[in-house]
Amino acid sequence: MKTHRLGRSGLQVSELCLGCMSFGDPLRGGHPWTLPKEESRDLIRQAIEAGITFLDTANVYSDGSSEEIIGEVLWHIARRDEVVLATKVQGVMLNEPQMQGLSRRSILHNIDASLKRLRTDH
């Protein structure tokens, strides 16, 4: 898989990015069509094996369960320094309606929560 530098960051990302909006617990969040953990795990594993090392998700995808699945799968199959994770923080989480938007407090809170769900510190 070809890689490219991401902007001016110096990060090298795979030419393809795996969008993870369709991964998560179908009973959480507003998308009942999401793939449950077992099916999501298989797709993430196949993507990593094919050289896709850039994954995109968001805090609100299936109310955080997309990030939880990604974190769990990557914990078992990949070294953290080999994968670039992109997530978002603006969306409204079902269990935290006051922690939305782009205030400093909300951003810092949602970054910490996403890192915890993704099982990483960066």
Which residues fall in each region the model found?
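N-terminal binding-site loop/beta-alpha segment at the start of enzyme catalytic domains
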Residues: 1-84
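Residue-identity detector for glutamine
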Residues: 12, 46, 90, 98-100
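Generic beta-strand or strand-like secondary-structure segments
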Residues: 69-73, 88, 106-113
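Conserved catalytic core of Hanks-type protein kinase domains
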Residues: 47, 88, 117
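Glycine/proline-rich, positively charged
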Residues: 27, 94-122
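Active-site-proximal loop/turn and secondary-structure-junction residues that shape catalytic pockets
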Residues: 22, 89-91
